[in-house]
């Protein structure tokens, strides 16, 4: 059984500290003047194209260079919060951060669907029902 939980949206984010120092990009071309943090080659990614922000607004299929590569979404967030540069992050991850600002909010990245999947044989068990309710309550908290 598969139940869709949520669409996870990705945007480009930077810290207050970084954006005060380097300025807020106003156009896609402005991104070329900024430092980017990205996924390292071969690192497992939650999206099909983890480097989409490096290619956003760049012509001829080229991409910007990243100044730092990490192997997890949390690593990206920590580097952004530390003021290292800009990075593409899932919206839910930054929802509780007071230090991170969405850059170019109309430039949305890929959308990833998150699903709750379990075997048919566990459909009516208390354990699955409790966990499903927990997941939907947490998603409700994040969306509000």
Give a label for each model feature.
Residues 114-124:
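A bilobed periplasmic-binding-protein/Venus flytrap-type ligand-binding module shared by bacterial periplasmic
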Residues 77, 118, 132:
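A cross-family signal for key residues in well-ordered alpha-helices
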Residues 1-114, 140-144:
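C-terminal regulatory
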Residues 123-137:
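Short amphipathic alpha-helical coupling segments at ligand-binding clamshell hinges
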């Amino acid at each position: 059984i598969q139940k869709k939980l949520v669409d996870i949206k990705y945007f480009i984010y930077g810290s207050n500290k970084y954006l005060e120092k380097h300025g807020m990009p106003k156009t896609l071309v402005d991104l070329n003047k900024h430092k980017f943090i990205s996924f390292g080659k071969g690192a497992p990614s939650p999206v099909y194209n983890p480097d989409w922000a490096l290619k956003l607004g760049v012509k001829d299929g080229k991409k910007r260079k990243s100044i730092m590569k990490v192997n997890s979404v949390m690593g990206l967030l920590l580097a952004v919060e530390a003021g290292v540069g800009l990075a593409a992050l899932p919206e839910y991850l930054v929802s509780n951060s007071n230090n991170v600002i969405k850059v170019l909010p109309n430039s949305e990245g890929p959308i990833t669907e998150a699903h709750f999947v379990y075997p048919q044989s566990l459909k009516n068990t208390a354990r699955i029902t409790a966990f499903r309710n927990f997941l939907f309550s947490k998603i409700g908290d994040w969306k509000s």
